[in-house]
């Protein structure tokens, strides 16, 4: 059975390591995601030592690395909660990987319909791991298998799985844009823009090397090389202006850029352990005009 791609395992590891290593209060509590990864998967991702211990340390470069995954996930959860209060009850996660929102946020899921879109083999593996852990699949969750290389429309795929095209949604694409072409991202945004007003897309993007803070450049180099070694080279980089222009051109009216400084001020200010997000990854939030 095919497993998840190893970059998704790394993201899950980063979220879990925050709880295991960093001081409370924790920005996000997600240890389930790393429990999904069995020992074989963790070894393949070079995250399990020969003695069976997780390869996790409190040193600053690794701490900043995991803060990236923590901040992006928390921002998404806050946005989903905010939009749910405004009546948006559909959540679509593109390239869901080891995402555990549906299993963890039981305070919100009774009011949501969640569609996880990912490769068929990844979803089959995830179902098996949830069953092995005794974790029930929530009634609100629909797995939507999609071969992203096939050219099939993810909008059509979620509609076939029960998505209501007459109601707005939150569309999440985190940790994806660096792996796909500008044309592919443009297509994704245009497809999202065919949905009804009130729909919001939240996506991460990677800055060009020249815009990275000097102290983060070595971490950036190591992270990029590790992704390439796992078979997922980074091919696309964007300035904030680039990404906002793409969203506007696709049809979004309300677009905003969430910087590393914004994330640090919102989630990491005043922490005793000094945890903070590095400068390489930023976020775009784009909403179609009109209220849900």
Can you describe what each PLM-predicted range is?
Residues 1-92, 98-144, 151-152, 165:
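Rossmann-like AdoMet
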Residues 5-6, 214-292:
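Rossmann-like AdoMet/SAM-dependent catalytic core
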Residues 31, 149-150, 177-179, 207-211:
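Short, catalytically relevant binding-site loops at active-site mouths
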Residues 89, 199, 253:
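Short acidic/polar active-site loop segments enriched in Thr and Asp
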Residues 141-143, 153-156, 179-192:
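A short, conserved alpha-helix within the catalytic core of class I
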Residues 158, 163-184:
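A short SAM/SAH-binding and catalytic strip from SAM-dependent methyltransferases
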Residues 170, 189-210:
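Conserved beta-strand signature within the Rossmann-like core of class I S-adenosyl-L-methionine
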């Amino acid at each position: 059975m095919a497993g998840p791609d190893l970059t998704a395992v790394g993201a899950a590891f980063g979220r879990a390591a925050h709880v295991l290593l960093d001081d409370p209060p924790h920005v996000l509590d997600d240890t389930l995601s790393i429990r999904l990864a069995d020992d074989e998967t963790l070894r393949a991702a070079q995250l399990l030592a020969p003695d069976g211990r997780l390869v996790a340390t409190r040193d600053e470069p690794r701490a900043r690395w995991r803060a990236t995954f923590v901040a992006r996930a928390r921002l998404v959860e806050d946005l989903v909660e905010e939009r749910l209060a405004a009546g948006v009850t559909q959540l679509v996660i593109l390239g869901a990987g080891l995402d555990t929102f549906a299993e963890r946020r039981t305070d919100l899921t009774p009011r949501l319909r969640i569609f996880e879109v990912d490769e068929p083999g990844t979803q089959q593996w995830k179902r098996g791991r949830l069953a092995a852990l005794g974790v029930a699949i929530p009634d609100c969750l629909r797995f939507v298998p999609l071969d992203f290389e096939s050219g099939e429309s993810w909008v059509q795929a979620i509609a076939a799985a029960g998505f209501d095209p007459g109601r707005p949604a939150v569309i999440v694409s985190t940790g994806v844009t660096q792996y796909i072409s500008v044309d592919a991202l443009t297509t994704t945004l245009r497809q999202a823009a065919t949905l009804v007003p009130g729909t919001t897309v939240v996506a991460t993007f990677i800055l060009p090397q020249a815009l990275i803070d000097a102290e983060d450049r070595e971490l950036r180099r190591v992270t990029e090389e590790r992704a390439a070694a796992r078979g997922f080279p980074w091919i696309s980089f964007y300035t904030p202006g680039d990404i906002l222009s793409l969203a506007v051109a696709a049809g979004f009216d309300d677009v905003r850029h969430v910087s590393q400084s914004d994330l640090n001020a919102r989630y990491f200010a005043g922490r005793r352990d000094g945890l903070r997000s590095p400068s390489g990854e930023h976020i775009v939030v784009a909403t179609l005009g009109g209220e849900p």
